[in-house]
Every structure is written in structure tokens, then in C-alpha cells.
Curated annotation (Swiss-Prot):
Species whose genome carries this gene: Echinococcus granulosus (Hydatid tapeworm)
Name of the protein in question: Antigen EG13
Alphabetized SMART domains for the sequence: SH3
Coiled coil: none
Biased composition range(s): Polar residues: 312-327
Swiss-Prot/TrEMBL keywords: Coiled coil, SH3 domain
One GO MF term attached to the UniProt entry: phospholipid binding
Record region (Disordered): 297-327
Length: 416
């Protein structure tokens, strides 16, 4: 019974943890954003905390409640080595049997004498009726009268013997009752002694199980748990932090009318720029090509044209621009590690590309077979063994679209 209740608590805790895990997984998809994520994270934490609470209840039912009962049973109920019966029960049966052994012998004798006496009485009553009927029959021929006379004498003789047997059995029955009465006080005394002993043993059992039931009640009384109210206080405080206006403003700054403008500006053609486009991504990902990677390009500004818009970034070609003099055209060539470091920092400060906004569609779970560090803002970074989702198959340049930790971006199908 206790084990069954503990299993119920364990199953409830397990279901709460599964529910919390699904909420956490939904949070990682990035569908919800801003302070509204507090709702899901708060519910997930409440489920985890309640799961822990009910896991502790299940553990408390097993130890000390169930374990204590099992130990008490081992100490007070011992199984026989030759049978499945309990030794204590068998001992009580033997003591009761010994206490009533003498009395029971007299009791059986009383029942036997009673049966014989009742049978003798029944026989006498039957013979009396037969004799009376024989005397009342009409007279017939002399021969018939002589025959009935003989039969009547036989019945009267049987009746006399029956009456004598009735007296004999009556006397035996009375003596048996008297003998039984003589041993009855001792029988009552012995039976009372054994019965009181059994009652004391049973009282000990009931008192112990009452104590264990009260302990079980204390374990199950969830209202008395000090951290129960705190769980829901924290949930309420977490949900209260949701700010719709702040979330809408943040979304507008990132994707709406309040976002920083990023309009195209004139850029002078350079052959190296082709390595930064989507057509040249395979070369950018190849660290063994022996070439160099163009990581920064400052715009050449004609004397008769104004400078580019300060702080703008061309997301299509991954080129940062800033107002410089005409002769200030330079290209910075660094090692792969330095380029990765600079690009990772720039990714954190650059709004996501419109083509890579998470629309919430389901993806195909995949596991990375290699390490890759995204060079551009629209690329994903991952380590070998990481799990993420594939959203689109490989394009003609060998790039796939995927989602990792709620962020959508590109990754190479394989390193070349």
C-alpha cells in the first residue's frame, strides 16, 4: 500500500519534470521573446520545484515509513522454516488449544451423552405410540387375537427396555454436564490468560501502525511543507515581471519601424569582395586553401560624393563602412583566429538578417560531426556533438539553413 502510494508520487514528479522539459525546449525555439519568456520559464521552474517536492514525499514514504514497518515485521513476525505460517500465530494457536484441551474432552462427552439421551427418548416415544395403537385395534379371530397378543407383549418388553435406556442415558448426560461444569472455571482462567496475551500483542501492532500512519500523514501533508508557498510566490513574482510595452519596443527596435536604417551605399568594386558573397562561402570556410581572407574593407569615397552613412553595415557582403578620405583605402588581413574573434563580436551587435528570423517552423534534429565557428553574422557556430535543427537542405554552394539555441543561420554541410 505504501509502495503503491510512493509510486504514484514518483509518477507525478516524473510527469512534472517532463512538462518542465517541454517548456524549456519550447523556450529554446525562440518563438517567445522578451519578458514574456518569464511566463514559460516561471511555469517550468514551478513544475521542477513541485517535482522535487513530490520526489521527497515518495522518498519519505519509503524511508522511514515503509522501511520502519518492514523492520518491525521482521522483529515481531517470524516465518516458520518448514511452512509459510507465522511462528507467533502458530504459538497462539497452540496455547489456545492447550488451554481448552481438558475442557474440550468433557465437552465432546457431553455432546455424545446428549445425543444418546435424545435418541433413547425418541425410541421410547415411538414404542409408546405403537403399544397404544396395538391395544386399540379391533378384535379379530382367535388366531389373530393370539398373534396380536404376542406382538403386543414384545412391544411392551421393548418399551420397558427403552425406558430403562432412557433413564440410563439421562443419568450419563447429567453426569457429563456436571463434569464439564467442574472444569469450566479452569478453562475460563486458562483461556482468559492466553486471550489477554494475544490482545496485548495485537494492541502493540495497532499502536505501532497508528504511529506509522501519523508519520505517513506528516509526509503526505503537502500544505505543511515550508517551501510550497514559496514556489508559487516565486511564480507570481516571475510572471509579474512580464512587460508587454517593453517587449513590443524591443521588437520594434530589432525588426520594426524603430530599427536602425541599413540602406545600400555605393561601393567600389574589388575582386576580393567576391569571396565574401554567398557564391564564395566554400572558400571562406576552407582553412587549408593557403589564401587570405578579406575581413575588413573601408569604402572609397569620391571627392564629388558625400561620405557613407555613419555606422551602417552591408549585411549582404559583410562589409563595414565609415567615412574616410579618398586615399584611405585599406584591407586588413588577419589570421583565421583573429577574424573569427572579430566577427563573433560583430555578430552580437548586428541585428539578425530578415531572411533568418525564426518563423517557428519545425526542423529536423541533427548532430554536428565537426567544430565550426561562424565567420559572418548569418552563420551558426557549434562544436562536434552539438544538437541543433536543420530547416533547409543544402544549396548549390554547400550551405544549409538551421536553428541552434533559438537562432536561425547558415552552416556548411561539410568542411572542405
Amino acid at each position: 500500500m505504501i509502495q503503491e502510494r510512493a509510486d504514484i508520487e514518483k509518477a507525478y514528479a516524473s510527469n512534472l519534470r517532463k512538462f518542465a522539459a517541454r517548456l524549456e525546449m519550447f523556450l529554446r525555439t525562440g518563438v517567445e521573446y522578451g519578458t514574456a519568456t518569464n511566463i514559460l520559464s516561471g511555469l517550468a521552474k514551478e513544475a521542477e520545484d513541485n517535482a522535487e517536492l513530490h520526489s521527497n514525499i515518495a522518498a519519505g514514504l519509503i524511508n522511514p515509513v515503509q522501511l520502519g514497518i518492514k523492520n518491525w515485521q521482521r522483529e515481531n513476525f517470524h516465518k516458520s522454516s518448514i511452512s509459510t505460517s507465522i511462528k507467533e500465530v502458530k504459538n497462539f494457536d497452540s496455547e489456545f488449544e492447550n488451554a481448552q484441551k481438558t475442557w474440550y474432552k468433557h465437552y465432546k462427552n457431553v455432546n455424545r451423552c446428549k445425543k444418546e439421551y435424545f435418541h433413547a427418548c425418541k425410541t421410547v416415544r415411538s414404542l409408546q405410540v405403537q403399544v397404544q395403537n396395538a391395544k386399540n385395534e379391533p378384535f379379530g379371530t382367535p388366531e389373530q387375537q393370539a398373534q396380536r397378543g404376542k406382538e403386543l407383549r414384545k412391544m411392551e418388553d421393548k418399551l420397558r427396555k427403552g425406558i430403562m435406556e432412557e433413564e440410563k442415558t439421562r443419568k450419563a448426560y447429567e453426569e457429563a454436564i456436571s463434569s464439564l461444569s467442574d472444569v469450566t472455571p479452569r478453562y475460563i482462567e486458562d483461556m482468559t490468560q492466553v486471550f489477554n496475551k494475544a490482545q496485548a500483542f495485537e494492541r502493540e501492532r495497532i499502536v505501532y501502525f497508528k504511529e506509522q500512519a501519523l508519520q505517513m500523514q506528516a509526509v503526505l501533508d503537502i500544505s505543511a511543507k515550508p517551501n510550497l508557498s514559496q514556489i508559487f510566490v516565486e511564480l507570481r513574482e516571475t510572471v509579474a515581471k512580464v512587460d508587454a510595452d517593453a517587449d513590443l519596443k524591443k521588437w520594434s527596435l530589432a525588426y520594426g519601424v524603430d530599427m536602425a536604417p541599413n540602406f545600400p551605399v555605393f561601393q567600389e568594386y574589388s575582386p576580393e569582395m567576391s569571396a565574401l558573397g554567398k557564391k564564395g562561402r566554400s572558400a571562406l570556410a576552407d582553412g587549408s586553401s593557403g589564401g587570405v581572407t578579406l575581413t575588413s574593407l573601408k569604402t572609397f569615397t569620391s571627392p564629388d560624393r558625400g561620405g557613407p552613412i555613419p555606422g551602417t553595415t552591408d549585411s549582404g557582403s559583410n562589409i563595414s563602412t565609415s567615412p574616410v578620405h579618398t586615399t584611405d583605402y585599406t584591407s586588413s588581413v588577419n589570421g583565421a583566429a583573429a577574424a573569427v574573434s572579430k566577427e563573433k563580436q560583430r555578430v552580437e551587435d548586428t541585428p539578425p538578417y530578415p531572411d533568418f528570423v525564426d518563423d517557428g517552423r519545425p526542423g529536423v534534429p541533427i548532430r554536428a560531426l565537426y567544430d565550426y565557428v561562424g565567420v559572418e553574422a548569418d552563420e551558426l557556430s557549434f562544436n562536434s556533438g552539438d544538437l541543433f535543427e536543420k530547416l533547409e537542405d543544402e544549396d548549390e554552394q554547400g550551405w544549409c539553413k538551421g536553428r541552434k539555441d533559438g537562432r536561425v543561420g547558415l552552416y556548411p554541410r561539410q568542411l572542405r
